[in-house]
């Protein structure tokens, strides 16, 4: 049974279980226990699995380690401490690992000193880190004399499990601590780790599992994820310690200008930097988060340029920077040498960065959990308040952040989504298992299903992965895909095959795809530049985009290259900054829909401003801006909300545009829009352009192919969204690129073989060839199934798109169809994505201003 911890132990009760030197050390250093420690330490001591959800700076890492360290000290005191690994600590960040080692070695040294003063000598408790940075010399030392506490990453653990000598050393593990669970649960690195833990448990017998997480929801699911399942299908028992709100959080939403529509870009930018300067001046250390890496660079650059006093005091920190640069920034921050750091996502995790007084978010963080994680970096100690300010730059952002801040204050978190049954990760582990010994098929199936991500795995899918590994799909051999295991279904057994198999496993395990820069060439082979793979995924033939200040039309792709044709003066269909944007969570999107209804009902209330200011704690500027925005929409068109879905048709000289106001987040909108565009292009026999945002999507057709209201209503009666989307994905760049990732993880295309690294271009060509072969001959091939699952469930959000469609079908949401001369105010942001190349934010604002002026004239609001 999984239950919430009810009992808060007293300091005395905890001191009672601690060894004398540990007790004295703790008393001297901290004096008293923090909430997570009061709930967790004794339970871990008793051998319970525990998940701790608490803010940064609440001592959760020590809560996890204290009981384990205490046990090691007790053993040491009795002379029973052996040379073996007792504690395994796994974290997704290599940087975090070095932090943890430092933060463990110090207390261990101090405890030995205390013991020495008390008159007895304790043996040294050794701590070691094993990651891809660890030298083979260090690794050999660990085999000969294993550390008592081993610190590692999910990737290195998977390799260690198959290291013949070292895996023997893992048999003695008693405690496993998984840190930053929130950063693992939603992706395949987490899947990878959970399978490793089940394999470890099979090797070492039962151990205590301790999960540490920042703010995350629903905790029951996350606990099942960390603890795993019993063979009868019930979750393993354990405790949830939820002290995620032990720390006070203050969140303010601010607009840097009074008028978000008419302020020109230069003034807006001036106001933003002026406000940032004020905030940095008022606080000792400020951490600024932008939503993109390029944004982080830009903000840091402008702050230094505009305010020379900050030249040495401001740095940027994001994942594109080299490791050394990042470490240097973290060190400076810890020593208090910086006034401000600008980051994209790289500082969200618990790297120890010393004390931060204020966190500023520029633009919406798109999810309540992310907002709380980022703002939780402020006030690093428990009694300090986490102060956060969100600065908004447009009206949609203002509405979204108003709801987001309200949810954060009222602890309404977004649900996380844990990938289910990723077959590519399963391939790696079944191969890893075959390297250990000969397995009974049913035993292996049972083991896999103990891991949360696979607790619903069908036997069919499991067998299809084994059959693929055993080379039972004809036609793959000549594509150089060879069998890696033998499989005897009659006997119900499988095992390793081939000398090279172990090397293949070592060289190719892991879940993070190699990031590719895609080269862009003209058809006559002239090199133009590179784009990110994420950007290339979005391209469809005929798409027009800007690179190095010129416009090009996408023609085709070969391997790692894409070919284009210069198209001077053509209007781009895809903005360059699109690939990095964070998607809005579905739960928050629904709350914004409800907020729209609430504001709609306030529009004629003379006290509207006051009501909004009180309930949502926004200032007068913000309340006025929101009400103004909604009044314009209501006058010109209809306000879509949780019961009304607005679809607008806007005709231009040559094109017909359809705006679907489906406020369900970009991931769900991507699923819907691609399926709809596919159906329309089949029916009308023409190309359909798509633009997608969190608040809806737009379809663009030639004017003579326009859709009737009936056509649009029929789209929403769509029977099978999955099947339609699958057809829509056929031949897309997205499918080709994602298939390479899945084929890498599923060892169909090896990144490294015989000590050589295969070029990404080569891999991509192989992927395209294999994809064609499999689609034609084996539509049920496990890795083909997985690439569709990954795109539809992890990249897009098909489940919530289906849910939304069902609400429309059941009539819970009514469709309102309008023909408008211009897009309504709520559609402005979509119009811009599909309108002009808004490489520059200035052009965006200019365009919105022009649209706004025309509409105000139409509803008679211009003097």
Swiss-Prot record:
Question: Which residue stretches belong to region WH domain?
Answer: 418-512
Activity modulation notes:
Unwinding of dsRNA duplexes is inhibited by AMP-PMP and ATP-gamma-S.
**Residue span of motif DEAH box:** 179-182
Annotated GO molecular function terms are: ATP binding; ATP hydrolysis activity; catalytic activity, acting on DNA; DNA binding; helicase activity
| Helicase C-terminal domain sequence ranges | 275-424
Q: Where is this site: Wedges between bases of the loading strand?
A: 512
Question: Positions of the region Domain 4?
Answer: 513-863
Please name one Pfam family that this protein belongs to. Answer: DEAD
Q: Which SMART domains match?
A: DEXDc, HELICc
EC number(s) per UniProt?
3.6.4.-, 5.6.2.-
* The entry's keywords: ATP-binding, DNA damage, DNA repair, DNA-binding, Helicase, Hydrolase, Isomerase, Nucleotide-binding, RNA-binding
Q: What is known of its domains?
A: Composed of 2 helicase domains, a winged-helix (WH) domain and Lhr-specific domain 4. Deletion of domain 4 leads to decreased ATPase activity, slightly decreased DNA-binding and loss of DNA unwinding or annealing activites; the isolated domain binds ssDNA and RNA less well than intact protein.
> Which family does the entry's similarity section mention?
Belongs to the Lhr helicase family. Lhr-Core subfamily.
Please report the name of this protein according to its UniProt entry. ATP-dependent helicase Lhr-Core protein 2
């Amino acid at each position: 049974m999984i239950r919430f911890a009810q009992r808060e132990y007293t300091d005395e009760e905890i001191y009672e279980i601690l060894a004398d030197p540990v007790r004295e050390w703790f008393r001297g250093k901290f004096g008293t226990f923090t909430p997570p420690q009061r709930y967790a330490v004794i339970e871990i001591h008793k051998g319970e699995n525990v998940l701790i959800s608490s803010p940064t700076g609440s001592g959760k890492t020590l809560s996890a380690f204290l009981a384990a360290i205490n046990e090691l000290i007790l053993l040491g005191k009795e002379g029973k401490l052996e040379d073996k690994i007792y504690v395994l600590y796994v974290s997704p960040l290599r940087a975090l690992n070095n932090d943890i080692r430092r933060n463990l070695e110090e207390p261990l040294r101090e405890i030995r000193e205390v013991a020495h003063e008390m008159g007895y000598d304790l043996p040294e408790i050794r701590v070691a880190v094993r990651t891809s940075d660890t030298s083979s010399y260090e690794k050999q030392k660990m085999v000969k004399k294993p550390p008592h506490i081993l610190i590692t990453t999910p990737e290195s653990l998977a390799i260690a499990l198959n290291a013949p000598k070292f895996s023997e050393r893992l048999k003695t593990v008693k405690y496993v601590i998984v840190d930053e669970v929130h950063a693992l649960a939603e992706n395949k690195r987490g899947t990878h780790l959970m399978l490793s833990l089940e394999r470890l448990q099979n090797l070492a017998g039962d151990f205590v599992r301790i999960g540490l997480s920042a703010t995350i929801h629903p905790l029951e699911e996350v606990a099942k994820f960390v603890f795993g399942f019993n063979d009868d299908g019930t979750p393993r028992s354990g405790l949830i310690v939820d002290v995620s709100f032990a720390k006070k959080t203050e969140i303010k939403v601010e607009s840097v200008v009074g008028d978000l529509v008419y302020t020109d870009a230069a003034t807006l930018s001036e106001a933003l930097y002026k406000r940032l300067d004020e905030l940095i001046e008022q606080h000792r250390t400020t951490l600024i988060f932008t939503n993109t890496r390029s944004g982080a660079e830009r903000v840091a650059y402008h702050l230094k340029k505009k305010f020379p006093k900050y030249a040495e005091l401001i740095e940027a920190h994001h994942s594109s920077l080299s490791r050394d640069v990042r470490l240097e920034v973290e060190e400076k921050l810890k020593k208090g040498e910086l006034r401000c750091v600008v980051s994209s996502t790289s500082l969200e995790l618990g790297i120890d960065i010393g004390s931060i007084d204020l966190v500023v978010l520029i633009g919406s963080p798109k999810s309540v959990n992310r907002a709380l994680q980022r703002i939780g970096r402020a006030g690093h100690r428990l009694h300090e308040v986490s102060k956060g300010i969100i600065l908004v730059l447009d009206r949609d952002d203002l509405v979204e952040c108003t709801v987001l801040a309200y949810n954060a204050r009222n602890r309404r978190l977004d649900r996380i989504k844990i990938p289910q049954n990723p077959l590519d990760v399963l391939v790696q582990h079944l191969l890893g298992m075959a390297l250990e010994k000969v397995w009974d098929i049913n035993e292996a199936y049972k083991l896999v299903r103990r891991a949360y991500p696979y607790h619903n795995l069908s036997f069919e899918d499991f067998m299809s992965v084994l059959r693929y590994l055993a080379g039972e799909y004809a036609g793959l051999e000549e594509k150089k895909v060879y069998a890696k295991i033998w499989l005897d279904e009659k006997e119900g057994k499988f095992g390793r095959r081939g000398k090279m198999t172990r090397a293949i496993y070592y060289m190719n395990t892991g879940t993070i795809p190699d990031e590719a820069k895609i080269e862009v060439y003209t058809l006559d082979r002239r090199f133009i530049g590179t784009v990110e793979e994420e950007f290339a995924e979005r391209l469809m033939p005929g798409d027009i985009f800007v690179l190095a200040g010129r416009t090009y039309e996408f023609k085709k792709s070969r391997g790692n290259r894409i070919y284009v044709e210069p198209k001077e003066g053509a209007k781009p269909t895809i903005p360059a900054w699109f690939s990095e944007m964070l998607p809005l969570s579905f739960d928050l999107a629904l709350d914004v829909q409800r907020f729209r209804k609430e504001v709609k009902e306030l529009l004629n209330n003379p006290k509207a401003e006051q009501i909004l200011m009180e309930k949502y704690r926004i200032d007068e500027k913000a309340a006025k801006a929101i009400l103004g925005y909604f009044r314009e929409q209501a006058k010109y068109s209809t306000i879509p909300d949780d019961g009304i879905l607005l679809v607008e048709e806007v005709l231009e000289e040559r094109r017909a545009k359809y705006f679907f106001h489906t406020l369900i987040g970009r991931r769900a909108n991507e699923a819907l829009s691609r399926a709809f565009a596919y159906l329309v292009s089949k029916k009308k026999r023409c190309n359909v352009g798509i633009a997608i945002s969190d608040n809806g999507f737009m379809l663009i057709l030639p004017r003579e192919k326009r859709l009737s209201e009936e056509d649009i209503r029929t789209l929403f009666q769509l029977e099978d969204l999955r099947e339609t989307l699958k057809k829509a994905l056929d031949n897309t760049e997205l499918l080709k690129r994602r298939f390479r990732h899945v084929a890498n993880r599923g060892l169909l295309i090896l990144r490294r073989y015989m000590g050589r690294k295969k070029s990404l271009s080569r891999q991509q060509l192989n992927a395209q060839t294999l994809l064609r072969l499999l689609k034609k001959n084996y539509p049920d091939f496990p890795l083909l199934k997985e690439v569709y699952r990954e795109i539809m469930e992890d990249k897009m959000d098909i489940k919530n798109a289906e849910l939304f469609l069902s609400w429309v079908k059941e009539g819970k949401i009514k469709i309102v169809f309008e023909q408008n001369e211009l897009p309504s105010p709520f559609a402005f942001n979509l119009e811009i994505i599909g309108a002009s190349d808004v490489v520059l934010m200035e052009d965006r604002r200019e365009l919105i201003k022009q649209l706004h002026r025309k509409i105000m004239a139409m509803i008679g609001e211009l003097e």
